[in-house]
């Protein structure tokens, strides 16, 4: 009797999807996911490293699947949007900052001052300290208020104010979109700075995230590419040849930072505390001081990768001009000294997810009212480059892009990883993390409503995690910076993350199937709802 009751109880607990979306929903099958992911993470694709042969195979495979599904090419008459890249190695010895005060100069390099900038540039100017480098009108906070950064070098803290304060006007123990150094670099550029210099936030004990360093494999990435020492191949840095920042970002060590504050008669920790008290900016010019900077590179080459994009046009004459996006990234880490970095979970799983949903929506007789763009980004492991390029060169207008569902690592169960500090539930076999829903309660409510059919265990813990700074570490972040509700769907870290052991036999295909069914239902609701989910600028995780 017990065995008969369990299926009946499950049927009561989880409703069936509406008949109008049933065909596409039923087409999402674990067997297809396994076949596709087995290919995408196979030795033949050589780890899909950006600008190498394996990534080109992945690009062509994704495009061919979009064509088989009958998607409309989204990049003119092609599925491929070129992403112009510069690959280079930063010269740690010739990349320098020279600080001059009272006629005395000191040149900093290496561990004291580093940068990874694609162009070889030099310049000099006065120095201003601009707090955390944040301009947030909705929070009534502007570190640039009262200072003139034009033609100057701007020094800032990493992170954001009140990170340990649950009552913060920012996001307390989580992050807002302003804590990322790539945002701060563009903000400094908008204020006329000629270079940005970041230093460790003296009030934050976590790792210095999101700061490109000379020779770093993932500039601006926020550390998501970190791996165990010696295990990961040494990979040249990549940057956008078009659409990236035009000024360099330097990171300086504690000794150099303390010296600059000493010139101003201040201590960094005291200034940090003063900002936190209100919070209010405490910016100032560092008197009688100039910095001369120089960046240098080697092994520089220009090449294109590609975002792969296909479209299902909406069925509603008015709403089809609006867009719902499903995204992932296809690139990984290539071949290292220990073998091939297969990237089954990261991010073969997300790539297969987007392709699977393209087939599901195409197979469903009833089409969504809004148009749906399926896009798989290039060079995410190199700094979200494909996504950043897209938002500066959109294939569909950003103003009418309503929402993004971004898949990155949706195939595993979260397990303890010594590189990641987080609390883990005793059972993660049915768990899905949603990162960034604190910016859109409407988004969260939609997914939770559709989850009544699927029955996953949803967690929002990463929105309260300033330490690992996951908000900035996948392709939804550039959309969030353009006020588009973008959420990263993520099943969590594990010891195989960025290791050669991230292989297909470890994927939980049953859970991955449920995640894609939930995304399908959520995507349909986003596409058919009277209005899109609203972005809440004053984000606060609960």
Question: Predicted regions span which residues?
Answer:
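Second-shell loop/turn segments in exported
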Residues: 20-27, 43-53, 114-118, 129, ...
């Amino acid at each position: 009797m017990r065995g008969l009751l369990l299926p009946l109880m499950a049927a009561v607990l989880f409703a069936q999807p509406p008949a109008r979306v049933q065909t596409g929903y039923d087409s999402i099958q674990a067997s297809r996911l396994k076949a596709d992911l087995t290919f995408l993470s196979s030795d033949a694709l050589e780890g899909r490293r950006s600008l190498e042969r394996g990534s080109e195979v992945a690009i062509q495979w994704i495009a061919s699947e979009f064509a088989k599904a009958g998607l409309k090419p989204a990049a003119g008459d092609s599925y491929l949007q070129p992403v112009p890249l510069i690959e280079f190695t930063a010269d740690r010895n010739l990349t320098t900052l020279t600080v001059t005060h009272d006629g005395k100069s000191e040149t900093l390099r290496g561990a004291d001052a580093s940068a990874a900038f694609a162009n070889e540039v030099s310049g000099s100017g006065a120095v201003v300290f601009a707090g955390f480098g944040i301009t947030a009108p909705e929070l009534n906070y502007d570190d640039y208020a009262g200072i003139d950064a034009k033609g100057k070098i701007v020094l800032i803290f990493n992170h954001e104010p009140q990170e340990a304060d649950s009552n913060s006007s920012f996001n307390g123990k989580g992050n807002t979109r302003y804590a990322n150094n790539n945002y701060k670099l563009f903000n400094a550029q908008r204020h006329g700075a000629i270079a940005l210099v970041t230093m460790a936030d003296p009030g934050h004990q976590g790792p210095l995230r999101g700061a490109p360093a000379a020779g770093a494999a993932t500039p601006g990435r926020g550390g998501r590419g970190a791996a165990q020492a010696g295990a990961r191949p040494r990979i040249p840095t990549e940057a956008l040849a078009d659409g990236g920042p035009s000024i360099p970002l330097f990171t300086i060590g504690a000794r150099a930072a303390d010296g600059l504050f000493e010139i101003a008669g201040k201590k960094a920790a005291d200034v940090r505390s003063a900002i936190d008290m209100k919070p209010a900016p405490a910016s100032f010019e560092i008197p009688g001081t100039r910095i001369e900077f120089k960046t240098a590179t080697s092994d520089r080459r220009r090449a294109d990768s590609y975002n792969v994009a296909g479209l299902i046009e909406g069925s509603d004459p008015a709403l089809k001009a609006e867009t719902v996006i499903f995204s992932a990234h296809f690139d990984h880490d290539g071949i290292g000294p220990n073998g091939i970095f297969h990237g089954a979970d990261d991010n073969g799983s997300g790539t297969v997810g987007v392709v699977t949903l393209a087939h599901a929506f195409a197979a469903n007789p009833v089409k969504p009212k809004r148009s749906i763009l399926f896009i798989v980004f290039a060079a995410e492991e190199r700094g979200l480059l494909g996504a950043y390029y897209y938002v500066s060169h959109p294939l569909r207008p950003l103003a009418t892009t309503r929402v993004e569902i971004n898949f990155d690592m949706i195939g595993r169960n979260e397990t303890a990883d010594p590189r990641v500090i987080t609390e883990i539930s005793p059972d993660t076999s049915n768990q899905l993390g949603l990162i960034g829903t604190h910016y859109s309660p409407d988004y969260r409510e939609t997914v939770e409503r559709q989850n009544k059919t699927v029955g996953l265990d949803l967690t929002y813990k990463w929105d309260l995690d300033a330490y690992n700074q996951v908000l900035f570490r996948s392709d939804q972040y550039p959309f969030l910076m353009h006020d588009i509700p973008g959420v990263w769907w993520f099943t969590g870290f594990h010891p195989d993350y960025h290791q050669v052991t991230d292989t297909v036999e470890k994927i939980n295909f049953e859970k991955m199937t449920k995640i894609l069914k939930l995304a399908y239902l959520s995507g349909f609701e986003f596409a058919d709802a009277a209005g899109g989910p609203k972005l809440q600028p004053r984000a606060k995780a609960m």
